Amino acid sequence: EISACLVGSEMCIRDRNVVCKIHIKVDTGMSRIGFMCQEFPRDDYSVEEIRTACTLKNLELEGMFTHFCVSDEAEDGKDFTEKQYSCFSYVRDKLKESGINIKICHCSNSGAIEDYEHTYCDMVRAGIILYGLAPSYKIQNNLNLIPAMTLKSTVAYVKNLKKGADISYGRTFTAPKDMKIATVPIGYADGFIRQNAKDGYMLVNGKKAKIVGRICMDQTMIDVTDIEDVKIGDEVVIFGTGENGEMTADDLAKNTDTINYEVVCLVGKRVPRIYIKNGKVMDVMYKL
């Protein structure tokens, strides 16, 4: 069952016979979507807009929410997060005074779940912490998170190269010695972006294999010169928990100057999703 998000009075539809459950979005400072309620003098206008929307017979008010934009910034974001929550609370209380019953109020994203328990209201919206990843490097992992996602592939090809051989597009890597190179069938079309080649490695047979040359659309080459008995079909760990020395989503994010959200969200539809519980495969999903 899906509830719609109402972000402004212009979205209200008055001439349909269908009743739509809605959650009202209140913009308390992110300036993305929602009824503008960023400053108390301006709140009453938005409160009136929301009141008007709630009188429409084809809208069933189920909830109201806002989104914190710096709840993952530790002390740097505390004052603004508290201001956002105060604005939201003001709107909620004003509507309650008008007799408007909001069943579900929710504000807390992953950062707020970590550090702002008083903002939980009736529901929280867990995002990146569902992956077992902290929302930023700045806040403490008070929830004792354990990364839940591992990205794996297999060795597709193994070749021996002589000193002086070039690898991948642009000939950006030249073998400084005789080398053994494995090709892994994953590339930027799968969300493993070219920037991951910078200081990047994969785990093969429990050992680190440095990425060499540019990452291609569908394939990546790694140096397995010092890893014994590498053969086609061997498991390759691209990122995971880090417990066995493999890179983590946080490592890849730091190397590419981005955030762990982007690393896990970029994993493309060509990659099957295997869901495991207590060591047992529960489901396998193919999106293509």
Features from the language model and the residues they span:
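Residue-level recognition of specific faces of alpha-helices
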Residues: I2-C5, T154, E262
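Single conserved hydrophobic/aromatic residue that forms the stacking wall/gate
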Residues: E1-G8, I13
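Active-site loop/helix belt of alpha/beta enzymes
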Residues: R14-K21, T28-T154, L161-K162
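Internal, well-ordered alpha-helical scaffold/interface segments
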Residues: S153-A156, A182
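Short glycine- and Lys/Arg-enriched binding-loop motifs that mark or flank ligand-binding interfaces
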Residues: A4, K25-M30, L59-E62, M123, ...
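C-terminal accessory subdomain/extension
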Residues: N160-L288
